[in-house]
Amino acid sequence: MALPGTIVQIMWAACLRCGLGVCLVWGGFWGFASEPSSAASADFNQPTIQSLLQNHCVSCHGGVKKRGGFSVVSLEPMLGKGDSDVPILVPGKPEASLLWHRVQTEDVSQRMPPEDQPPLTTEEVHLMERWIQEGAHWPLHWAFEPPKPGSQRSSQLHPVDARILEVLNQKGMEPSEPAAPTVLLRRLYLDLTGLLPSSDQWSRHLDMLSRGDVHSVVDQILASPHFGERWARHWLDQARYADSLGYEKDSVKKDAWQYRDWVVQAFNADIPFDRFSALQLAGDLIDPENPQALLATKIHLQTQFNLEGGIDAEEDRVKRVIDRVNMVGATWLGITVGCAQCHDHPYDPFSQSDYYHLMAFFNNVDEEASFLHRVPDEAQLESVMMERRRLQDQLETMLQRQLTDKSLNNQVVGQLVKLFQYDQNKGLTRHMRERSQQRRATHVLIRGDFRRPNLALGNMEPAVPAIGKFLPSPPNHVDRRFLAEWLFSENHPLTARVFINKVWGHLLGQPLVETPQDFGSRAQEPVHRELLDWMSSWWMDQGRWSLKELIRMIVTSKTYQQSSNHRPHLSQVDPQNRFFARQNRFRVEAEVLRDIALQMSGLLDLRIGGPAVFPPMPEVVIQQSYSRYHHPSQGGDRYRRGLYTFFRRTAPDPNLMVFDCPDASASQALRGSSNNPLQALAILNNEVFHEAAQSLAQRLWNDSDLKTDHQRLTRLFEWGFGRAPSEKEADMILPLLAATRAYTGEHPDQLSALQASDLSEMDQASERAAWVALARLILNLDAFITRE
């Protein structure tokens, strides 16, 4: 419901005068965290031969085109002759190398790069000559080298801070001052639980922070059951989780939520990341009798399913397998393996054959339905199985009756329908299972077309790609268990780095490696590479792959705890804050924004787990879906956390999407953070935020201890920010309240736009309406929607 125009004008004019700013107005002076640059725009100004070849040669001699019959993606293809009789590269002999002749010839028709491409500079030509003369050494890409722990640092410094400070000192920079205790506590709660501290937590934990007991505060927050919800949302972005199947029909996945709940429980239990990952990759092989292990494999069922008429079932199956391969590459390897589906990777040493060897791990996996849901003990499991056997016996009896007595046909058919509609939520769920018979052959698909298998290359057996020099000896029988073991081998160069980079991005506002889903040869080496390598080595060894230990290590550092305040000098020397001389300031995610608004208003239902719920959604969006099914939940379900909101792929909640929620079509490592006018309008006019503002105003009026405007304003700030408003803030906001109060008193016809029906019957309705308007403004403040 929209606010009356005049009230909006009063509220915004006052905000502009006071400088508090709503989401639409500037988003704060320093703004949001810098967006990671794309792989295509990575900086290759380093004086290396690889960057020279990537910049000038790979477009014609990469994994796609391979003109002249050779590629410059790696050294080996250049050591042959390609389509010519002259070797492309002869280490130590530039004069015998075709590559050298082509870059330095005066013949324009022969010179490379061609005329329509930027030419090599004199320095670059000399670099290539010197490189060949010195033996054509090809250094390994930094991300393909195993992490090195580096040298020991002073034990007096936090290990994260010691490595950050070393780089800052080299650059002549200093870290920022510590954040205010209220800012730090709010930051910790938003980062670790996605919620605000309660009144008791504000009081108790601020007292602990004042005594310097940060570790105990962190431990208590990590122990919250809401930790699992917060970090499950991050993981579900990578798992491309949704509650519907996609495509035109976009039918409901009735059991999708069971995987989501498994992830929440796994993070709360702090299952080590290697075990957490292995169960998702191969739970049906690792522990086939364990219902929880089978539930974990539902990550592979987050693909889209096409239920349209007339489709080719095999084409749809292959698309799902390909989606799983690409998800594994993005989530665990941080490599764009999908580029090799149709041809060799354009710029990474990852061939098309490598892709289909990887695909072979998943090509013999089928979906299976079993009774798995909520079976905490053997007694309940046996009860479910007995019921299943009873129903099977009943079904067989009815079938026999149907065969012998035609007069019972209608009755039997009706009974059969009832049996087949047996409540699926009582245990039946889909999961993955490796097929043991009639196994499918995996072939390289020409141009990625499932109808064009390259039979000449033979069957692609399951195999892992060589990453750098890391290629362990496979066992006799290779399956998804080996894939999981390979990913978490001691010397694997990517798995720990890739995940830690994303965790750092969630906690510091931007990752150490700017391309979190592409650690390939175009990924810039991070300025804090030694920190990334040290954390990777520490996490695998001492941290035991524990997510909570990793988070504890980061958030107890001074680097995490420093202020995010703007510093003019830093904006000149490090505008993107790549060196982390300050914290980053950014808008909270879509779900968190809704959650904290409902929490502050007292409406938020904090129940954990269960089927998806249906908050109010615009009818015009509902009509976009094929089924047009969306009946708003009632009672507490209407105000559950955003994690539990039903997500339909073809008609997602626009209030999620306007705040950069991913569309679940592909794995998303880190969300973007945009700033646009629609966001302010969504908060101002969305039905849920309107109800939150009404409830927040009512919550203030229900507190009999609050007698004055200043006391109520103070309580608002205490709930939202853990502090009282400053004198300047109060002087700016209270006149706004007075102006709104005067307007509502003079225009009683507009009270219904601000009040719930129960409020309109109260005395002093215009007074309460003014507080509803102010509550809506507070929920739209940049300070409220921003994590500092």
Question: Where are the language model's segments positioned?
Answer:
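Solvent-exposed helix-loop boundary motif
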Residues: F32-E166, T182-R187, P197-W202, S244-L245, ...
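Short, surface-exposed polybasic-aromatic patches that bind anionic ligands, especially phosphate groups
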Residues: L774
